[in-house]
Structure formats: C-alpha cells, structure tokens
Amino acid sequence: MRKTSYGIALALTIALSLVPGSAFATLQEDQTPLSEEEIQSALAHGEVGPAPNEPAPAESGESSFVQNFSGETRFDTSSMQALSAYSSSEYVIVVADGGWPDALCATGLAGVLDCPILLTSGSSLSAQTADAIRKLGATRAVTLGGELVMSARVKGDLESLGLKVDRLAGETRQDTQMMVYEYGKRAPRGRTWSTDAVAFASGARFHDALSFSPVAYAERAPIFLTDASGNLNSAQKSALRGRAFASSVVLGGPIVTSSDTVSFAGSVSTSGKATVLAGDTRFDTSALVARWAVDSRGFKWDNAAFTTAELPYDALSGSVLQGRDRSVVLLVADGSSPTVTELASHKGSVSRIRFFGGYLSVSRGTRMSIMHALGHKYSDLAGYRVYIDAGHGQNDSNNGLWDPGAIGNGWREADLTADLARRVGNILTNKYGIACYVNDKGGYYKLRQADAEARDCTSLVSIHFNSGGGTGSESLRHSYHAAESSFDLQRSVHPGMISGVGLKDRGMKTQQVAVLSGKIPATLLEICFIDNSHDMATYNSKRDQVAESIAYAIANA
C-alpha cells in the first residue's frame, strides 16, 4: 500500500520489482474522490449496492437505546411519528410540506385539540397521510395555510375520506397564526389555551419555535410569530392584552425578536417579566429551551429527540410525540453541537434517545458522536451495520481485472484481506450480534464508500497488508475528507489490531485514501508487512486471534 507521494512510490516500485518475491503495496495513483454525479451514475447502472437478487439486510427502527423515526419520504416519517403518538384521534391537523411557517404555531393547537399533526404534499393528499388518517379514525381535520401552499384538492381529498375540514389561512403567516389562536379559543370539549405559558418566536425562521414546540403541545401554549423585524402586529397585541400567563417566553435574541416584543411579553406575564431564551446560535438556543423545559416545566431528558436544523419537516409531527412524553427536541449539526453537550451532562437521566429523520438529516457520524458523548457503544445505534472491506480484488482499479495488491513471501494481499475480512465478519455476526456486510468481492476502490452507503452501513473498516521493507501495524483515516467520527472509530479499532497482531505499533495516521473519503465514518487497517517474513510468520500463527481482537474492538467501539 502506498504511503508516499507518487514520485517516491514510483521509484520504490521500480526498485522493489528487482527483488524476487517482493512487491510494493501501492494504492492506486489517483485518490481524489468521485463527484456526486459519478456516484449517482454508478448507482443508476447497478455498479454499487445490493444486486437485484441479493437478500436485503434486516431493518431495525430501534434498539434498546435508540428509536429511529425515518421513512422513505417526509410523509412516511410524519405518519410514523403521528401513529406513535396516537392510536386514535377525532382531529388531525394537516400541514403542507411547503408551508412550515403556518405549521410553527400548530403544536399548541394540537395540544388544545389533543391530536397529531400530519404532513402532506401541497398538491394532493399524500397516500401515507391518508393511510394514517384512516388508522387514526379521524373525522375532523384542520388545515393550515392558503392555496399557494395547500391546494383545494387536498381539502377535497380529506373530505372524500369523510372528514369535516376547517381551513385556517390568512394573508400573512401572522394572520394565519392569529386564526389558529382564535380557533383554539373556541375548541370543542371545553379545551382551550392554558394560561401556563405563551411564547413569542420569529415567523421568518423555524428553529426557535421548533425547539419550543413540545412545550407548546404539552402546555397548550400559543406561539405568537413576529415579523421579519421581530415585531408583533396590533391584532396580536390586542388579542393578548389583559391576559396573564405564568410564563411568557421570548425565543431568540434581538435579531429575531425586538426589544418591543420582549417588553410586551413581560406585560402579559404574571411576574411582569419575560423569560428570554436566546443563545449565540440556534443550537445554543435549542439547548437553553430544553434546559428551561426540564427545570421549569416538568419535562425530562429521557427520550430526547435529535433533529436537523436545516429543515423543519422531520420534527413537525415529532414535536407532538415529544410533547406527549414531555421530552425535549434538540437541534443538532454535529457531535460538537451544544445540544449534545447539554444532553451528555444529564446522561444519567437518559435511558433512550430518538432521531427524527434519516442520515441526510442526522448523519451517521453525528449519531456515532452522540453515542460516545452519552457513554454508549456505536452498536447501540438502531440499524448499526459495519462494512468490512477486503482491500484489492476483482476490478479494484475499474479495469475489469483482478488486483492482487502487494505480493511477498508467496502471499497475495487480496487473498489475505478477503480471508481476514470474512473471519472478522463472522465473529461480529455470530458472537456479537452486530450486522455487517463483508465485501470480499472487490469492486472499484473509489466506489466502496458509495457501496457501503447503498447497503445502509453505518461505518467502514478496510483491511490491507503493507509492503515496502518495514515492520509492524498501523491505521489510517482520511487526511482532509474523513466523515465525522472517523477519528473516534480509528482510535477505538486501532488498539484491537495492535493487541491482536502483537507487532510494532506504527501509529494512527492520516492519508488521502479514496476508500476513507465520504459520508461513512471509516478507518483502514494495515495489518503487517507482507514482504517481511517475520511479520507474516507472526500473523499466520495467530490469524484467529487477530480477527477476534479486531472484531472485539469494532463491537466495543
């Protein structure tokens, strides 16, 4: 395997070719990653991923510690969340996937109506949404937003299911929010807005209101939306003037909520003062909202749900689920987000967490970082699956030929990597119960990350043998394009390799290696030097031990 620049590698390759029975184990010369277009083309042509007749891996939406709420589409995810929160409901609130501003104030109304929120396409009622409505046995629907975001056809589709439909739609998002507030005041069964809490949040961005939404549901608290300048309009102020709430909460700093809004919020609080929850970033604010909810509103850290801050859709329906459980929603970007740090400081109170959305929303690496922060193993993730990659082999260079890799002392690297990969995979599956895919069939080296992703794997461990006159074992991660958690994965697996092989520890290193570049947290193991007779004698005397040690390290990462 190459460990140097092209020029040096070429010189060493020429020199070593003069030594009988020896070869320099090079990586292919070009280690730049493929473009997304090239990867998508390979997927479309069936060059990566499961073959049509290949059995699909068993899917798991949850483990003892993690629940995943992720469907093929945002409508599937929404339906999963709604049906987890409710087995039956008279009402449903239906919002369009293009109308998140209208949905920001929906969770409080869902608390008043004691019902779930469902997401639909704006052009017609999504099949998944219709199916969820049937399962819930709903007879009434409230839709939010005008025909620019939700067509008349959606209303017709709902009515064809036998639902009485009330559409709440104003000329602006603040007008719609006021219609939601007035609707909640005359809700059936004697339920209405409580006086426990009221919140004020930007109507121009969703992050702060989304973090507060479980509280809005649980407390039946109205959320009043400010305009682009952070101000309330006269109708909003008039509706609240003279009311007194136990908590009047302003979400976000002066950029999104003006000083006038803060002052007005204080005037409708029994204490005469608003509670301002505003951090330097949307993630800081999310952590502050969660802490306030736990400390002041009887919420809990258990069952905390992580969701993306890029789009609101994965958490709109989930906010109701969180509100029913009195659990928090936490916005996350990566493992260093303040929300992760906040939850980790309370990990003794956490027996389960949730993820809203798939890997595009909360990446594999971020999930793995969260698991470590909470003191759990990667394998505690729902759906955790390891891609064990045997280096080299058939079509490794995308030329249709079988690539032996390094050759030395009568051994071919590709034979050794395939054997060890199979051993590690068998131990992971049969001893530790960890799902894995063993790639002992080769394939273009630049597509192995994509293959792992297409097979829904969470992490990747690539097995290689070294060459070039040295001795010992080492591991690699990508020098500049490693997925989040790659270093932690390397740091966890490297000692297992060293312990198993028992040769010199050459260290944890970085290198530009295509198989390590991409969305999958990955590390590459250089087991020993194939052209060193002592290294190979040592390895061959303990193949099972090496496999067991590596598998143990992966299982306990």
Region locations from a protein language model:
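Active-site-adjacent mobile loop/cap segments within catalytic or ligand-binding domains
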Residues: 455, 460-470, 476, 507-557
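Active-site histidine-acidic residue metal-binding/catalytic motifs
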Residues: 378-449
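Second-shell loop/turn segments in exported
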Residues: 67-69, 94-97, 201, 307, ...
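A short, glycine/acidic-enriched catalytic loop
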Residues: 395-412, 467-495
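Extracellular glycan-binding segments that recognize GlcNAc-based cell-wall polysaccharides
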Residues: 6, 26-379
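Bacterial N-terminal signal peptides that target proteins for export
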Residues: 1-8
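Extracytoplasmic/secreted envelope proteins and their assembly/folding machinery
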Residues: 78, 106-110, 130, 155, ...
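Bacterial N-terminal signal peptides
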Residues: 11-19
